[in-house]
């Protein structure tokens, strides 16, 4: 690994059951077996990112634990994340800690809300993130299961989310184990979700949505796509949605997962994605008479009832977010309602730029500048994302005990920086610690 790990280590029996029992006793897990986060597993994950293990992504709620890359890697190792998928886990947490996602409220509410990860980009298949039949459960893609689980474990073990204590969720939901799926981009007639967020189509992007659950919709009767869209809108506007608890419907987003067969039909009936979204918004309402008197009173006080006695769910069409995924069986859609307190967030995935092998080779060459004088260079820290390396000059050879024969640090530094910049193929911020300087 690039630097020595800071986390303490434990020695236990080489038995999966032993670690499983330990994880249950310590409260690290979610009730399902975990993989032991061995040095080898954690190191393999760390080599997949350009970030230093000590780099902090942010503070994870609810207890504001510092999410260092090392701690994220430990939890990802327990979840079974493959090294190639680790940068996606980091990107998801980068999105999660943004204030707009409001993760502190999400992790402590009585609601069942939990982050859902939606992935776009060319790595979907390589990482085995499901987007066809069974993509929201049952397809068994390793990426789908482990990436979402890693984020949940980080909230538990780094953020301190504990059911019944810091988390007051009344019911929870299956997605609290972890929910991650991808968009079936090749079957979508519209720009991808990532493109709509401003990313290029060839970028790997993860989008976080605060989802209250997965609500299935089925229609075996309507052949007309506009009638189908009408019924879909009515289902989304269910009477006790969180949107009807707010002063306005101008909050959060609702993800509408549409199977490829329905998506093709909607694309023929509506000229653009925006016109389809506007049609859904226009018909996502219920008559005020649907509610009981106590509900009606609150809705009227909040000025949610229009002149025709309709209560619209959302204010803007872009709050209804179609995503194409699922099998080819048609007949079904799924919508993921928001709890209205989180704004959907997207982040690009960044892989490693310096591998451990590349850095080791660069350091080996740099060490030749001082070893002939009986000195050495010790790596203290490396942060590829920031282009920063911290080295310590070690003088220990008895023939040069005072270090007088070794060039001063201020003279050595530009020579070492030149070697590292050339081997690492980029500008470098080098700090050289010379213990001979008081």
What is the predicted function of each stretch?
Residues 1-350:
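Non-transmembrane, aqueous-exposed alpha-helical and coiled segments at domain scale
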Residues 39, 348-438:
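Domain-level signature for proteins that mediate thiol-based redox and metal-cofactor handling
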């Amino acid at each position: 690994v690039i630097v020595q790990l800071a986390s303490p280590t434990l020695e236990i029996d080489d038995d999966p059951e032993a670690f499983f029992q330990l994880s249950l006793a310590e409260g690290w897990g979610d009730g399902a077996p975990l993989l032991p986060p061995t040095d080898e597993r954690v190191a393999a994950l760390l080599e997949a990112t350009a970030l230093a293990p000590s780099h902090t992504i942010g503070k994870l709620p609810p207890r504001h634990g510092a999410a260092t890359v090392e701690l994220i890697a430990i939890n990802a190792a327990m979840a079974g994340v493959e090294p190639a998928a680790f940068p996606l886990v980091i990107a998801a947490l980068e999105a999660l800690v943004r204030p707009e996602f409001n993760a502190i409220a999400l992790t402590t509410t009585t609601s069942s809300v939990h982050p859902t990860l939606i992935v776009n980009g060319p790595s979907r298949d390589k990482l085995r993130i499901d987007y066809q039949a069974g993509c929201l459960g049952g397809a068994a893609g390793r990426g789908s299961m482990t990436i979402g689980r890693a984020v949940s474990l980080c909230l538990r073990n780094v953020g301190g989310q504990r059911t019944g204590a810091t988390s007051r969720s009344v019911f929870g939901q299956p997605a609290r184990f972890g929910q991650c799926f991808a968009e079936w981009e090749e079957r979508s007639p519209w720009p991808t979700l990532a493109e709509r967020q401003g990313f290029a189509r060839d970028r790997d992007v993860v989008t976080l949505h605060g989802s209250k659950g997965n609500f299935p919709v089925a229609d075996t009767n309507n052949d007309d796509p506009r009638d189908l869209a009408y019924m879909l809108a009515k289902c989304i506007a269910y009477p006790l949605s969180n949107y009807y608890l707010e002063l306005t419907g101008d909050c959060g987003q609702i993800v509408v997962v549409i199977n490829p067969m329905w998506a093709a039909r909607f694309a023929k009936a509506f000229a653009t994605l925006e016109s389809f979204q506007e049609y859904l918004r226009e018909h996502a309402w219920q008559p005020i008479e649907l509610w009981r008197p106590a509900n009606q009173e609150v809705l009227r006080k909040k000025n949610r009832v229009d002149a025709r006695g309709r209560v619209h769910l959302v204010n803007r069409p872009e709050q209804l977010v179609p995503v194409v995924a699922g099998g080819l069986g048609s007949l079904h859609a799924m919508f993921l309602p928001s709890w209205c307190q989180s704004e959907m967030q997207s982040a690009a995935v960044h892989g490693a730029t310096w591998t451990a092998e590349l850095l080791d080779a660069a350091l080996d060459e740099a060490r030749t500048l001082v070893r002939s004088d009986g000195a050495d260079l010790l790596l203290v820290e490396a942060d590829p994302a920031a282009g920063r390396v911290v080295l310590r000059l070690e003088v220990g050879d008895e023939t040069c005990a005072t270090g007088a024969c070794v060039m001063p640090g201020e003279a050595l530094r530009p020579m070492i920086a030149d070697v590292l910049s050339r081997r690492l193929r980029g500008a470098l911020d080098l700090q050289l610690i010379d213990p001979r300087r008081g």
